[in-house]
Amino acid sequence: MASQGQRVSWGDESTKRRGRSNSRGRKNNDIPLSFFNPITLEQGSKFWDLCPRDFVPKGIGNKDQQIGYWNRQTRYRMVKGRRKNLPEKWFFYYLGTGPHADAKFKQKLDGVVWVARGDSMTKPTTLGTRGTNNESKALKFDVKVPSEFHLEVNQLRDNSRSRSQSRSQSRNRSQSRGRQLSNNKKDDNVEQAVLAALKKLGVDTEKQQRSRSKSKERSSSKTRDTTPKNENKHTWKRTAGKGDVTKFYGARSSSANFGDSDLVANGNGAKHYPQLAECVPSVSSILFGSHWTAKEDGDQIEVTFTHKYHLPKDDPKTGQFLQQINAYARPSEVAKEQRQRKARSKSVERVEQEVVPDALTENYTDVFDDTQVEIIDEVTN
């Protein structure tokens, strides 16, 4: 494929043969997520016979990038040990992305139907795929949708998943309480027998009980769980604790581009997390100092805000913060910078003979000089 691409042309291909195949399609394991909701068909309908050539969803990319393919996802359910096939689903991906990211436009592939608007370019787009922490978008088209196509709408998956988890946790807690009560009853019987024997020997058991009770209270306060409680919360209200943050916010991508491998793997347990957090605006600053917009997106409301603020160039925290932006796209460069910083740090420790306050723990003031860095943060939920 030429690097510059060319304008779309359908002159060398028959509509009937766009993606038709005889097999059941590829496996659905580890398929990248589509930006859009899927399409299902009426029973007996063939997607490749009905799909218009310019059947590209609206809402993402420029005019040159309105090109891609619909990918078939086969589905089934096991019922009493037997496989029961479910209706196929078709998901849209832009050219150069998704499960067939390396395929050329109009390349004959199993379970793939190519589509493009007339003024698009036949070169790979840079639009990527949807992150795991983002909701899929409702399908909208400039062309007429075939009556046999059913456009799926977003389901409240988080709510149903939360209810399922809540029921499971409730059962587990009930079983745990039952076992605990049984064990406690046995322990109480043994304890009462021991206390009675000690009392006969003249031992002050009440004093020992008070001491043991205080010890238990201190122990329970030390082992209190500080892990953030994220159950039944929207994705945008969850808080990452110590550990991998991708399970809450997805892998690093163009829509979630902050954090190197160390920060993503350790969350707020990362070495420089406190200093990085100091560079982030407060809730009230975001709420009252941002530009907000909202629009309907299927059965949900999509909210976008843009927030601009300044950081001083000569503050060490600013340099650390900037290094985390788009770090996922340059892993080798980031690793080299980290090694250099570590070497410089060891060199300074050997040379210096006195303890110097750590500049990275200084607090910001509201007044900065003219040597500043401007950061514009746009978040869409």
UniProtKB/Swiss-Prot annotation:
<dbReference type="InterPro" id="IPR042548">
    <property type="entry name" value="NCAP_aCoV"/>
</dbReference>
<feature type="compositionally biased region" description="Basic residues">
    <location>
        <begin position="17"/>
        <end position="26"/>
    </location>
</feature>
<keyword id="KW-0804">Transcription</keyword>
<feature type="region of interest" description="Disordered">
    <location>
        <begin position="152"/>
        <end position="239"/>
    </location>
</feature>
<dbReference type="Pfam" id="PF00937">
    <property type="entry name" value="CoV_nucleocap"/>
</dbReference>
<feature type="region of interest" description="Dimerization">
    <location>
        <begin position="230"/>
        <end position="333"/>
    </location>
</feature>
<keyword id="KW-0946">Virion</keyword>
<feature type="compositionally biased region" description="Low complexity">
    <location>
        <begin position="154"/>
        <end position="183"/>
    </location>
</feature>
<dbReference type="GO" id="GO:0019013">
    <property type="term" value="C:viral nucleocapsid"/>
</dbReference>
<dbReference type="InterPro" id="IPR037195">
    <property type="entry name" value="Nucleocapsid_N"/>
</dbReference>
<keyword id="KW-0805">Transcription regulation</keyword>
<comment type="function">
    <text>Packages the positive strand viral genome RNA into a helical ribonucleocapsid (RNP) and plays a fundamental role during virion assembly through its interactions with the viral genome and membrane protein M. Plays an important role in enhancing the efficiency of subgenomic viral RNA transcription as well as viral replication.</text>
</comment>
<feature type="modified residue" description="Phosphoserine; by host">
    <location>
        <position position="9"/>
    </location>
</feature>
<dbReference type="GO" id="GO:0003723">
    <property type="term" value="F:RNA binding"/>
</dbReference>
<keyword id="KW-0687">Ribonucleoprotein</keyword>
<feature type="domain" description="CoV N CTD">
    <location>
        <begin position="223"/>
        <end position="336"/>
    </location>
</feature>
<dbReference type="InterPro" id="IPR044345">
    <property type="entry name" value="N_prot_N_CoV"/>
</dbReference>
<dbReference type="GO" id="GO:0044177">
    <property type="term" value="C:host cell Golgi apparatus"/>
</dbReference>
<dbReference type="GO" id="GO:1990904">
    <property type="term" value="C:ribonucleoprotein complex"/>
</dbReference>
<keyword id="KW-0013">ADP-ribosylation</keyword>
<protein>
    <recommendedName>
        <fullName>Nucleoprotein</fullName>
    </recommendedName>
</protein>
<keyword id="KW-1040">Host Golgi apparatus</keyword>
<keyword id="KW-0543">Viral nucleoprotein</keyword>
<dbReference type="GO" id="GO:0044172">
    <property type="term" value="C:host cell endoplasmic reticulum-Golgi intermediate compartment"/>
</dbReference>
<keyword id="KW-0694">RNA-binding</keyword>
<feature type="region of interest" description="Disordered">
    <location>
        <begin position="1"/>
        <end position="29"/>
    </location>
</feature>
<feature type="domain" description="CoV N NTD">
    <location>
        <begin position="31"/>
        <end position="153"/>
    </location>
</feature>
<feature type="compositionally biased region" description="Basic and acidic residues">
    <location>
        <begin position="333"/>
        <end position="353"/>
    </location>
</feature>
<keyword id="KW-0597">Phosphoprotein</keyword>
<dbReference type="InterPro" id="IPR037179">
    <property type="entry name" value="Nucleocapsid_C"/>
</dbReference>
<feature type="modified residue" description="Phosphoserine; by host">
    <location>
        <position position="255"/>
    </location>
</feature>
<feature type="region of interest" description="Disordered">
    <location>
        <begin position="331"/>
        <end position="353"/>
    </location>
</feature>
<comment type="subunit">
    <text>Homooligomer. Both monomeric and oligomeric forms interact with RNA. Interacts with protein M. Interacts with NSP3; this interaction serves to tether the genome to the newly translated replicase-transcriptase complex at a very early stage of infection.</text>
</comment>
<feature type="compositionally biased region" description="Basic and acidic residues">
    <location>
        <begin position="201"/>
        <end position="234"/>
    </location>
</feature>
<feature type="modified residue" description="Phosphoserine; by host">
    <location>
        <position position="253"/>
    </location>
</feature>
<dbReference type="InterPro" id="IPR001218">
    <property type="entry name" value="Nucleocap_CoV"/>
</dbReference>
<dbReference type="InterPro" id="IPR044344">
    <property type="entry name" value="N_prot_C_CoV"/>
</dbReference>
<feature type="region of interest" description="RNA-binding">
    <location>
        <begin position="33"/>
        <end position="159"/>
    </location>
</feature>
<comment type="similarity">
    <text>Belongs to the alphacoronavirus nucleocapsid protein family.</text>
</comment>
